[in-house]
């Protein structure tokens, strides 16, 4: 059954400005794995904004906000063909432990100005 749906859209320029204004932004928001991915793609702002929107969409699908979790508890990585995958840790993982067979679906897209992410979380009550 569907446990939650989340969507987020962000202007790419907002992420670009946040990175330029605050040297700690990347480490505060993204995991080491995510930052290594950004290094490989030359820190493209549209990709960074898409990952940020993905984290926000997942939190909305969880339905709890960031209470008792950090944004880095949500890690967005890619499979071998580039499909975005989600790994939950810490407080985010705790929020889904009350369900079994949890699947997190994620789609990320962007145009010149905006990045958008859509997430669906499926699972069964224990």
Curated annotation (Swiss-Prot):
Catalysed reactions, semicolon-separated: apo-[ACP] + CoA = holo-[ACP] + adenosine 3',5'-bisphosphate + H(+)
Cofactor or coenzyme needed: Mg(2+)
GO MF term set: holo-[acyl-carrier-protein] synthase activity; magnesium ion binding
Keywords, in A-Z order: Cytoplasm, Fatty acid biosynthesis, Fatty acid metabolism, Lipid biosynthesis, Lipid metabolism, Magnesium, Metal-binding, Transferase
Function of the protein: Transfers the 4'-phosphopantetheine moiety from coenzyme A to a Ser of acyl-carrier-protein.
Residues that coordinate or bind Mg(2+): 8, 56
Family: Belongs to the P-Pant transferase superfamily. AcpS family.
Matching InterPro entries: 4-PPantetheinyl_Trfase_dom (IPR008278), 4-PPantetheinyl_Trfase_dom_sf (IPR037143), ACPS (IPR002582), Ppantetheine-prot_Trfase_dom (IPR004568)
Principal cellular location given in the protein's record: cytoplasm
UniProt key word Transmembrane: no
Compartments it resides in: Cytoplasm
Name this polypeptide is given: Holo-[acyl-carrier-protein] synthase
EC number annotated for this UniProt entry: 2.7.8.7
GO CC, alphabetical: cytoplasm
Alphabetical GO biological process terms: fatty acid biosynthetic process
């Amino acid at each position: 059954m569907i446990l939650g749906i989340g969507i987020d859209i962000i202007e790419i320029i907002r992420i670009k400005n946040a990175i330029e204004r605050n040297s700690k932004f990347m480490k505060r928001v993204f995991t080491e794995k995510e930052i290594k991915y950004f290094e490989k793609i030359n820190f493209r702002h549209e990709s960074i904004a898409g990952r940020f929107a993905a984290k926000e969409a997942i939190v909305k699908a969880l339905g709890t906000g960031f209470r008792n979790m950090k944004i880095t508890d949500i890690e967005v990585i890619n499979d071998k063909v580039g499909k975005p995958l989600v790994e939950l840790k810490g407080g985010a993982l705790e929020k889904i432990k009350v369900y079994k067979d949890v699947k997190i679906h994620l789609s990320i897209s962007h145009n010149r100005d905006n990045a958008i992410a859509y997430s669906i979380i499926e699972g069964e009550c224990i």
